[in-house]
A protein has these predicted regions:
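Conserved GTP-binding G-domain of TRAFAC-class P-loop NTPases and closely related GTPase folds
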Residues: 83-166
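Phosphate-binding glycine-rich loops and adjacent basic patches that engage nucleotide phosphates
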Residues: 20-31, 114-120
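Hydrophobic, Leu/Ile/Phe/Ala-enriched alpha-helical segments that form helix-helix packing faces
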Residues: 17, 64-68, 107
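P-loop NTPase motor core
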Residues: 24-102
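Basic, amphipathic N-terminal segments that precede the first structured/catalytic domain
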Residues: 1-24, 142-149, 162-166
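Intrinsically disordered, low-complexity regions
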Residues: 10, 42-44, 152
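Residues that form generic nucleotide/phosphate-binding pockets
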Residues: 16, 67, 154, 158
Length: 166
């Protein structure tokens, strides 16, 4: 089982990740980390609150990238939004993460969930309007079942990671 991190607090999440107890973590829902912080700072004037929010989120991503073992997979679940150009992206707060960082660009795998014909699916590759991406040989089709265990097994198989459950 993955360790599900569902607490909207960067310090707690980063502490849990640094403990290195598990081979997989699920952060659900990462977008709420930004949204809750925005609400906490709603009475602050100016752009500093947006800068703080972006830096806290970027620090979380840096912790994931630099402070978890190579064979540890952190699944970041987030909401999406459509831009004014019709493209789909991870929903963020403010412009700093979008304009200076582009969150999706930090990851080698980005899947998007959707519902069709009474089934939930993941899209594994972009059609030019979504941020979806994965190594071409990782999945057999452009759409797969919305099954995180299947995804985890495919990633571990592709990269040669231990499939050990913890």
């Amino acid at each position: 089982m993955p360790y599900v991190i569902d607490e909207a607090d960067y310090a707690i999440i980063e502490k849990k990740l640094k403990e290195k107890k598990f081979k997989k973590y699920v952060i659900d829902d990462a977008q709420y980390l930004m949204a809750f912080e925005l609400f906490e700072k709603a009475n602050q004037a100016g752009y500093k609150k947006f800068t703080d929010i972006a830096i806290h989120y970027q620090n979380l991503l840096t912790t994931i990238i630099k402070e978890t073992p190579k064979d540890c997979i952190v699944y970041i679940l987030s909401h999406l939004e459509e831009t004014n150009t019709g493209k789909i992206k991870i929903k963020t707060v403010g412009q700093m993460l979008d304009n200076q960082l582009t969150v999706e660009g930090l990851f080698s795998i980005v899947l998007m969930s959707y519902y069709s014909n009474k089934q939930y699916k993941f899209i594994t590759q972009t059609d030019g309007n979504t941020p979806c991406k994965s190594p071409l040989e990782m999945f057999d089709t452009l759409e797969i079942d919305n099954d995180l265990k299947l995804v985890d097994n495919k990633i571990r198989e592709y990269y040669g990671f231990n499939k050990e459950e913890n």
